[in-house]
From Swiss-Prot:
This is UDP-N-acetylmuramyl-tripeptide synthetase. It is an enzyme of class 6 (ligase). ATP binds at residues 115-121. GO terms for biological process: cell division; cell wall organization; peptidoglycan biosynthetic process; regulation of cell shape. The gene is murE. UDP-N-acetyl-alpha-D-muramoyl-L-alanyl-D-glutamate binds at residues 25, 27, 42-44, 157-158, 184, 190, 192. One of its GO terms (cellular component) is cytoplasm. It comes from Shewanella oneidensis (strain ATCC 700550 / JCM 31522 / CIP 106686 / LMG 19005 / NCIMB 14063 / MR-1).
Length: 492
């Protein structure tokens, strides 16, 4: 419990003596004794639900106002109190941090990871490594939030500001040593992480995605860069193999954090890098170099991009104070992240690889990685999401056609759009559309490719990854591509 006046004290005085339990942005989730934050939203205005919130037992409602003269205005009603808060939408994270404090410098360090691709893998690798060293790790991101191995589906890459601060507070109370958090561009722009005391930030890469929201690549990049300007930040890690990372190295010279570079291509400005890289059927071997020395590592993860993700995770944990040699010793015991370059092999020696790749760059990276492990034909089965950036559809087709031997274009969360039209949009990017296979039913498409494949072939199933649904006509249908791949591998 907390006094309402203590919650509001950083912004304005309040004389009431009410206590409350939790904060919430969802009027449907209110329990007696909670405080409801009524904000204007992207689709719905929460201020429409003030009466409902009070009727359900809310102690108080904090009401967003754009009028500075209304700051601290109080309306007392029989069911509860309404308190006006100037530009509350901009302060939700800070308000949540008062109720659910996470104190920087205590036992838990927070690693924030941003970038178009690699956020999930890097965060999961951080958590695995901490756990392998007998620490306690938590993850927040696409695969869910929670202690490592106990993730609960979150719905968004970056949770809302209140959920986020409440969970960080709980993690700290549970003795978590490291929380690895995926930080989306949406989460940064919308202020959901404003009060999070990040101590290490990681940038993985930047390629075309979410332009339906950000408008152009410049705005998208600026959103990502916000993470490296937090006052709490002690260290920033930039992928210097990405041109944006190199540019940011110069742009971020005057931020509070110390900025470091990492590279799997031995970039001359990188403090953390790999050399003597050797890929094989079992993964990759390399020499890891960091400011205090070098050591050989052997990773079971496929592809150069996973080596980059691993290097990012190792470097971030080292900057948090962990011993690099101890970390490197645990690398052979890492397991692939669910739905990220996850392999299933049939009795006929056909390899199906389930991956979340859903951008042109991710398709290219995944196919390039698999080419090293493919003795036969390299296939790519993919689609594009509906109600999203239409401009990337032909680019997805271009990437698949250029880096795979055979392609099958199918559905991938058409949402409210016609899946056949999305397939047509993708095919516009092909140089030789007559060579592409198309099948709107994703299961049928995959089965058709498996039936045509031969021993030594590799089939990339791109786009779904860990997801357990296929969304069409606004309805989410149960669909688990990992389970399908496992079933097909066991049937052969």
């Amino acid at each position: 419990m907390m006094l309402l006046r203590e919650l509001l004290a950083p912004w304005f005085p309040y004389a009431g003596e009410q206590t409350f339990l939790d904060l919430t942005l969802d009027s449907r989730a209110i329990r007696r004794g909670d405080v409801f934050l009524a904000l204007p939203g992207h689709k719905v205005d929460g201020r429409q639900f003030i009466d409902k919130a009070l009727a359900q037992g809310a102690t108080a409602v904090l009401v967003h106002t754009d009028n500075p003269q209304e700051q601290g205005k109080v309306i007392v009603a029989e069911q509860g109190v309404q308190i006006y808060f100037y530009e509350l939408a901009k302060h939700v994270s800070a308000v949540a941090a008062v109720r659910y404090p996470v104190i920087q410098g205590h036992a838990m360090g927070i690693v924030g990871i941003t970038g178009t691709n690699g956020k999930t893998s890097t965060s999961q690798l951080c958590a695995q490594l901490v756990t392998l060293l007998s620490g306690k790790a938590a993850v927040m991101g696409t695969l869910g939030n929670g202690l490592w191995g106990e993730l609960v589906d979150s719905g968004n890459t970056t949770a809302d500001a209140i959920t986020l601060m409440r969970q960080l507070h709980e993690f700290a109370n549970k003795g978590v040593n490291t929380c690895a958090m995926e930080v989306s561009s949406h989460g940064l722009v919308q202020g959901r992480v404003d009060a999070v005391p990040f101590d290490v930030a990681v940038f993985t890469n930047l390629t075309r995605d979410h332009l339906d929201y950000h408008g152009d690549m410049e705005n998208y990049a600026a959103a990502k860069q916000m993470l490296f300007r937090f006052d709490s930040l002690r260290h920033g890690l930039l992928n210097l193999d990405d041109p944006i990372g190199g540019a940011w190295l110069a742009e971020l010279k005057n931020v509070p954090a110390k900025i470091w570079g990492f590279s799997i291509e031995a970039h001359k400005a990188a403090a953390f890098y790999t050399k003597n890289v050797r890929f094989n059927d079992q993964g990759v071997q390399a020499t890891l170099v960091w400011p205090e020395g070098e050591i050989d590592i052997s990773s079971p993860l496929l592809g150069a991009f996973n080596l980059s993700n691993l290097l990012a995770a190792l470097s971030a944990l080292y900057l948090q104070g962990m011993d690099m040699r101890a970390l490197a010793a645990k690398v052979p015991y890492l397991v692939p992240v669910a739905g990220r370059m996850e392999r299933f092999t049939t009795a006929d020696n056909i390899t199906l690889v389930v991956d979340y790749a859903h951008t042109p760059d991710a398709i290219e990276q995944a196919l390039n990685a698999l080419r090293r492990h493919c003795a036969g034909v390299l296939w790519c089965v993919f689609g594009c999401g509906g109600d999203r950036d239409k401009g990337k559809r032909p680019l997805m087709g271009q990437a698949a056609e250029q880096f795979a031997d055979r392609i099958m274009v199918t559905s991938d969360n058409a949402r409210s759009e016609d899946p056949n039209q999305i397939i047509t949009d993708i095919i516009q990017g092909l140089t030789h559309p007559e060579r592409a296979l198309t099948e709107v039913d994703r299961v049928a498409a995959i089965k058709q490719v498996v039936a045509q494949a031969k021993s030594g072939d590799v089939i990339l199933l791109a786009g779904k990854g860990h997801e357990t649904y296929q969304e069409a006509a606004g309805v989410r249908h149960d669909y688990d591509e990992r389970a399908l791949a496992r079933q097909l591998s066991e049937q052969s």
